Amino acid sequence: MQQGRTPLGAQNEAFPEKTMIFGLFGKKNNNQVIVDRQYQALTSAARMPEFYERLNVPDTVMGRFEMLSAVMILFFRRTRTSGTSGQEIAQEIVDAFFQDIDYSIRELGIGDNTVPKRMKKLAGMFYGRLEAYAKAMDTRDAEGLAAALVRNIHPKANEPVDMRGLADWMFVAEDHLLSQSEDVIARGSATLPKVA
């Protein structure tokens, strides 16, 4: 785990096959300072208190995993059409995300023999969300995105949970990321908007 990152189970935690397409735990290139800067910005965005206080994201370890997954998905969608440097940064950021998850599972005292199985499950959850959110976002379907967020963030809810506010923020965030230049992406300086 990179110095300066906090484990999933800690207060204000940074969470840290379909593929470990990104070469999970593979060799790094020379972008580490850029990657660390962008990763910190993304994890900070995922910890904005408004998500947990106003937009119905549970302030729990899994709630924060869900929020960071959403932020990572937004960044991945922005960089999918970027040049080589942007795609390399995205690859290393997703690697860092899963490394933090692995570290956090071990910090919680999970036995080494079960970590790979749990990692595989969490990776599957992440890529499942990537597909579900993309289906709604590609068609600008806010209601569909809100429904997908309810299924993933509140799978056991006994009463309806309104996730339209988070869905609306994700569309605003996607537009915000698209407005940022390739140079900003390559420098690891992309930002996400505050919750209105």
PLM-predicted stretches and their roles:
Residues Q2-M20:
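Short, Lys/Arg-enriched N-terminal segments with co-localized hydrophobic residues
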Residues F15-A196:
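Surface/interface-facing alpha-helical segments and adjacent flexible terminal/loop regions used
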